[in-house]
């Protein structure tokens, strides 16, 4: 099969480039003594999460589904944030989050 025969849309992921960037980020975090928290808005390619998980970064999530995705594929260090929460959603938010932020 050639690249022109692949079903579209598709993404080409260069694992070596992802790892190079994650190595750089991890190095900066270590030298600055800070914690890295990945935003799903910046990387929603969940098929890469097995690579990201190796680096131990936390993640941010703004929905129940993002929280579940983070818990299942990334880390226990999950920061929930939203301008508003519903009382009905709070049990699941607390179940999947390690931190809850109330922002505007």
Language-model region placement:
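Generic N-terminal amphipathic, Lys/Arg-enriched alpha-helix
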Residues: 1-12
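Residue-level detector of functional hotspots within protein domains
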Residues: 3-4, 22, 64
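A short, N-terminal amphipathic alpha-helix
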Residues: 21-29, 69
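Active-site-proximal beta-alpha core segment in soluble small-molecule metabolic enzymes
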Residues: 34-104
């Amino acid at each position: 099969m050639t690249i022109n025969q692949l079903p579209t849309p598709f993404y080409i992921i260069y694992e070596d480039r992802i790892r190079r960037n994650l190595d750089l980020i991890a190095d900066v975090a270590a030298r600055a003594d800070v914690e890295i928290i990945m935003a799903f808005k910046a990387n929603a390619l969940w098929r890469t999460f097995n690579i990201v998980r190796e680096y131990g970064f936390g993640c941010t999530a703004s929905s129940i589904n993002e929280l579940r995705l983070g818990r299942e594929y990334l880390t226990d260090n999950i920061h929930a944030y939203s301008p508003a929460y519903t009382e009905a959603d709070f049990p699941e938010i607390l179940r999947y989050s390690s931190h809850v932020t109330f922002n505007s």
